[in-house]
């Protein structure tokens, strides 16, 4: 038995999709356990680039089972469109399974997301406006509609009528917006549900059976630890738990069945949306990293904020997610920068802080304490092992591993699957 979780150690966009795709080659089941189509992952192989938002990266392997777990919120329309996108590119979806316990995103969630974000004005959190937060709100309030409900038109209608009473009061009285009628949703979304139906099952059974049979199961997190609703930079976070602990809740697999946790990080730091970012760069080096690394959001197209590698953040991620293996991406993007910096601690009111603070007010006043390292000029995009890297690049990787206290298992020197290299197997017993 070998089950592995892949989590982002920063604010998302670390390259989890690429690493999951790479690790999928040796897995038999690939599962997502939280989030929805607010996630965006880009996978490139054979010079073809694919962009997915909902479906796990393992879909490109016909012999892998791909699971959308119960902890997800699924937009039926977005799902049907993504399946069509894959079919147009001759990618089969026969190996896909959807949890009958996952919640669904409906048009009123999308509308509410936009209205709530606009209403916050200067205090907006930078939501992707995909309805994720409002869908999780309904789940917590116990009024959510699940995939199982979508399969039954009468049950779907009954819950829809009840929910729209409340939502329309909100739209009309609070936001002075037009109400939504049952007829605007019912038939269209029931039809989407019928297209989803062949994939729907009890995925907890699928996953536990696979693990019990000794199969390799890979769990794919969306977003990152710093966007976790409990452990991230609250309230500038997502509405679910991307940390490894979210696997047990969002997939129906017990904690005793998880073997290793791979923390994915860039060799620098990026962030989309608002919120504190201690190592953010506003200079020419920041622009260079953004352009060379093509740091624009897969889901939103927004330019990502860019900064130096922050070991305080990744150490925090290691602790709260129990990370056992480090996967460091986009090392090649730093090529050509004369002096590199790594944040080793924060300075707050003259005191050194080595752990990530809970208070955003404190964080906003923290100054990064940097350690400088010499960069490298050599092209490293063809490197196949640590020995192929220039000495300064190798030292940089070693220092990141030391500071984060996570052994390096994978590093990548470019966007293609062939540019990802294994230092030690994450599927070890």
Swiss-Prot record:
Homology family: Belongs to the adenylosuccinate synthetase family.
Residues engaged in binding substrate: 298-304
Protein name according to UniProt: Adenylosuccinate synthetase
GO molecular function: adenylosuccinate synthase activity; GTP binding; magnesium ion binding
Coiled coil, from the record: none
Residues reported in the UniProt entry to bind IMP: 13-16, 38-41, 128, 142, 223, 238, 302
Any single Pfam family the record assigns to this protein: Adenylsucc_synt
Top-tier EC class: ligase
Matches recorded under PANTHER family: ADENYLOSUCCINATE SYNTHETASE
GO biological process: 'de novo' AMP biosynthetic process; IMP metabolic process
Quaternary context: Homodimer.
HAMAP family: Adenylosucc_synth (MF_00011)
Involved pathway(s): Purine metabolism; AMP biosynthesis via de novo pathway; AMP from IMP: step 1/2
Binding residues annotated for Mg(2+), in chain numbering: 13, 40
Assigned keywords, A-Z: Cytoplasm, GTP-binding, Ligase, Magnesium, Metal-binding, Nucleotide-binding, Purine biosynthesis
Cofactor binding note from Swiss-Prot or TrEMBL: Binds 1 Mg(2+) ion per subunit.
Organism, scientific name: Oceanobacillus iheyensis (strain DSM 14371 / CIP 107618 / JCM 11309 / KCTC 3954 / HTE831)
Gene assigned in the entry: purA
Catalysed reactions listed for this entry: IMP + L-aspartate + GTP = N(6)-(1,2-dicarboxyethyl)-AMP + GDP + phosphate + 2 H(+)
């Amino acid at each position: 038995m070998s089950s592995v979780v892949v989590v982002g150690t920063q604010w998302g966009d670390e390259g989890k999709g690429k690493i999951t795709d790479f690790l999928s080659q040796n897995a038999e089941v690939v599962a997502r356990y939280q989030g929805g189509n607010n996630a965006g992952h880009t996978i490139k192989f054979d010079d073809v680039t694919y962009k997915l938002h909902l479906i796990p990266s393992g879909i490109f392997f016909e012999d892998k089972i791909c699971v959308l777990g119960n902890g997800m919120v699924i937009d039926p329309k977005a799902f049907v469109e993504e399946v069509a996108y894959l079919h147009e590119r001759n990618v089969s979806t026969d190996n896909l399974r959807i949890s009958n316990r996952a919640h669904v995103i409906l048009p009123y969630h999308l509308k509410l997301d936009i209205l709530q974000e606009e209403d916050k004005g200067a205090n907006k959190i930078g939501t992707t406006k995909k309805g994720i937060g409002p869908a999780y709100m309904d789940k917590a309030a116990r009024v959510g509609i699940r995939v199982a409900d979508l399969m039954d038109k009468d049950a779907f209608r009954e819950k829809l009528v009840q929910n729209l009473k409340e939502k329309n009061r909100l739209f009309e009285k609070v936001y002075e917006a037009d109400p939504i009628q049952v007829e605007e949703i019912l038939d269209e979304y029931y039809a989407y549900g019928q297209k989803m139906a062949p994939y729907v099952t009890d995925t907890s059974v699928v996953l536990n059976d696979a693990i019990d049979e000794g199969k390799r199961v890979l769990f794919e997190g969306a977003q990152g630890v710093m966007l976790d609703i409990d452990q991230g930079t609250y309230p500038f976070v997502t509405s679910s738990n991307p940390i490894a602990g979210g696997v047990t809740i969002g997939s129906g697999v017990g904690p005793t069945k998880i073997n290793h946790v791979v923390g994915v990080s860039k060799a620098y730091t990026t962030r989309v949306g608002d919120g504190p970012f201690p190592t953010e760069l506003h200079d020419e080096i920041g622009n260079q990293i953004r352009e060379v690394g093509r740091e624009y959001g897969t889901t939103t197209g927004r330019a990502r904020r860019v900064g130096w590698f922050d070991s305080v953040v990744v150490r925090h991620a290691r602790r709260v997610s129990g990370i056992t293996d480090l996967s460091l991406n986009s090392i090649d993007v730093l090529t050509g920068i004369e002096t590199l910096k790594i944040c080793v601690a924060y300075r707050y009111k003259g005191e050194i802080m080595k752990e990530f603070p809970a208070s955003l007010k404190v964080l906003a006043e923290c100054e990064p304490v940097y350690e400088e390292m010499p960069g490298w000029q050599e092209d490293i995009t063809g490197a196949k092992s640590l020995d192929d890297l220039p000495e300064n690049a190798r030292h940089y990787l070693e220092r990141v591993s030391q500071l984060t206290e996570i052994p390096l298992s994978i590093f990548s020197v470019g966007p293609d699957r062939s540019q990802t290299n294994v230092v030690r197997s994450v599927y070890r017993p």
